[in-house]
A protein has these predicted regions:
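Short Lys/Arg-enriched helix C-cap and helix-to-coil transition segments
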Residues: 55-61, 117-126
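Short Lys/Arg-rich basic patches
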Residues: 1-19
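Short, positively charged interaction helices/loops
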Residues: 51-77
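Short, basic interhelical loop/turn and adjoining N-cap
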Residues: 36-37, 95-106
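Short, amphipathic alpha-helical "recognition" segments used to contact nucleic acids or chromatin
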Residues: 73-88
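Short alpha-helical "recognition helix" segments of helix-turn-helix
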Residues: 27-30, 92-95
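Short amphipathic alpha-helical segments
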Residues: 17-19, 27, 34-47
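Intrinsically disordered, low-complexity basic tails/linkers immediately adjacent to helix-turn-helix/homeobox/MYB/SANT
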Residues: 64-74, 122-143
C-alpha cells in the first residue's frame, strides 16, 4: 500500500521497465503536479493497482490527510468501518451510508486485510473530532 507515507514499505529492488513516450510525459506531468518523483508515482500506481485488483470495488483517493482507500461509490473504507462498528450489521450500515450491501462487504474485506492502517485512520478522525469539539466548547464558554 502506498497511499499513506511509510505504510507497507518493504525492502525495495530496482526494476527496469519501458513505457510509451506519451505515458512518460503524462507521468512526469502528474509527478510535477503532485510534487513527487516519477519513481514514487510508479511505485504508488503499481501498489494501489494490485490492491484494487485484489479488492474489487476499492479505489484510492487523495485528500488533505493523504491518500486513502475508499469505495468506488463514495465513502472511505474507514468511514464504512466506523459506521459498521455502531450498527454491527451490513444491511443497516448500507442503508445508513446509502450504499449497496455488496459495497459495505467489499470495504469490510479490505479492512480485514489492512486492519491496522484503517484503525489508524479511524483513530485520527476521532482525535480530530474531539479536538474540534474542545475548540467549539471553548469558544462557547468565551462568548
Amino acid at each position: 500500500m502506498y497511499y499513506n507515507e511509510g505504510m507497507g514499505r518493504k525492502t525495495q529492488a530496482p526494476v527496469s521497465t519501458r513505457y510509451p513516450g506519451d505515458t512518460l510525459k503524462r507521468l512526469d506531468r502528474r509527478a510535477r503536479v503532485e510534487g513527487h518523483s516519477r519513481s514514487t508515482l510508479i511505485q504508488r500506481y503499481v501498489a494501489e493497482g494490485i490492491e484494487m485488483d485484489e479488492h474489487p470495488g476499492i479505489v484510492f483517493r487523495s485528500g488533505p490527510a493523504g491518500r486513502r482507500p475508499g469505495l468506488v461509490s463514495g465513502a472511505d473504507v474507514w468511514e464504512v468501518v466506523a459506521v459498521h462498528r455502531s450498527f454491527d450489521d451490513v444491511q443497516r450500515t448500507a442503508d445508513w451510508l446509502e450504499q449497496p450491501a455488496s459495497a459495505i462487504e467489499a470495504a469490510l474485506r479490505y479492512y480485514e486485510a489492512h486492519r491496522a492502517v484503517i484503525d489508524e485512520w479511524i483513530q485520527r478522525n476521532e482525535e480530530a473530532a474531539e479536538a474540534a469539539e474542545r475548540v467549539a466548547r471553548a469558544q462557547q464558554g468565551a462568548s
